[in-house]
Amino acid sequence: MRDAGRLSDVDVTATLAADVPVDALFDVVEDLGTYPDWLDIVSRAEPVEPLPGDDGVGGAAAWSVDLRGQVGPFRRSKRLRMVRTRCERPDVVRFERREHDGKRHSEWVLSAELVDPGADGTTGALPELRMRLHYGGNLWVPMLDRLLSDEIERSRPRLVRYVNDRSAG
């Protein structure tokens, strides 16, 4: 049953097949601090102190993340506290919203899965990144679908460039 006023949950999956080192790609997607460098809707992602109840994994596992978007004159921004809740190098990383202000918050989940076709000895196929975003709140409006879709398309070459620059330097 939907909450009153809720349009619907948002579930988006995007894939990227790219000729980049799998380990270097994983290094980028496992660290939310890199996202502002290649994903424009993430305007800021700063590490924050992990707190009891975060259930974070993998070192600095919590970030304060600012999301922003604009369609015509309409602007939206959102600050989230995200925690890396799963990290299985070099295959899977998952981030979940974890606020500690005593209020009830909408669910945000971002996961990334990497498939390295060369890991089993095959040649010629490119590594594939599959990212999934789930938003369980009621503030999503249809025009944000277009914004997100456009941003995903623009981010693909930026991510490849960013990974290649980091692995070369």
Predicted regions and their residues:
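Short, surface-exposed coil-to-beta transition loops
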Residues: 11-13, 76-81, 104-110
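Solvent-exposed residues in well-ordered beta-strands and their adjoining turns
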Residues: 17-21, 66-70, 85-87, 115, ...
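Beta-strand/loop substructures that line and gate deep hydrophobic ligand-binding cavities in soluble
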Residues: 94-154
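A short, structured loop/turn motif at beta-sheet edges
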Residues: 22, 50-57, 85-91, 113-128
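Short amphipathic alpha-helical signal-transduction/dimerization elements
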Residues: 33, 148, 152, 156-167
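Hydrophobic pocket/interface hotspot
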Residues: 25-29, 35, 84, 131, ...
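Glycine-rich portal/gate segments that line the openings of hydrophobic small-molecule binding cavities
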Residues: 47-99, 162-166
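Hydrophobic ligand-binding cavity/cleft-lining segments
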Residues: 1-62
